[in-house]
From Swiss-Prot:
<dbReference type="Pfam" id="PF00471">
    <property type="entry name" value="Ribosomal_L33"/>
</dbReference>
<protein>
    <recommendedName>
        <fullName>Large ribosomal subunit protein bL33</fullName>
    </recommendedName>
</protein>
<dbReference type="GO" id="GO:0022625">
    <property type="term" value="C:cytosolic large ribosomal subunit"/>
</dbReference>
<comment type="similarity">
    <text>Belongs to the bacterial ribosomal protein bL33 family.</text>
</comment>
<dbReference type="InterPro" id="IPR011332">
    <property type="entry name" value="Ribosomal_zn-bd"/>
</dbReference>
<keyword id="KW-0689">Ribosomal protein</keyword>
<dbReference type="InterPro" id="IPR001705">
    <property type="entry name" value="Ribosomal_bL33"/>
</dbReference>
<feature type="compositionally biased region" description="Basic and acidic residues">
    <location>
        <begin position="1"/>
        <end position="11"/>
    </location>
</feature>
<keyword id="KW-0687">Ribonucleoprotein</keyword>
<dbReference type="GO" id="GO:0003735">
    <property type="term" value="F:structural constituent of ribosome"/>
</dbReference>
<dbReference type="InterPro" id="IPR018264">
    <property type="entry name" value="Ribosomal_bL33_CS"/>
</dbReference>
<feature type="region of interest" description="Disordered">
    <location>
        <begin position="1"/>
        <end position="26"/>
    </location>
</feature>
<dbReference type="GO" id="GO:0006412">
    <property type="term" value="P:translation"/>
</dbReference>
<dbReference type="InterPro" id="IPR038584">
    <property type="entry name" value="Ribosomal_bL33_sf"/>
</dbReference>
């Protein structure tokens, strides 16, 4: 069987609350860092989430 090309990543809040989401992405097709606007329940507003390495 073929090996999967998707890797798990962590999207961490830039608001400094420590909240994060986990997801996966295809790093061969999209090698750049992901940045999304998502809801931070600790800050109670939409903030930017940046991709960081999942430990």
């Amino acid at each position: 069987m073929a090996k999967g090309g998707r890797e798990k990543i962590k999207l961490e809040s830039t608001a400094g609350t420590g909240h994060f989401y986990t997801t996966d992405k295809n790093k061969k097709l999209h090698p750049e860092k992901m940045e999304l606007m998502k809801f931070d329940p600790k800050a109670r507003k939409h903030v930017a989430y940046k991709e960081v390495k999942l430990k």
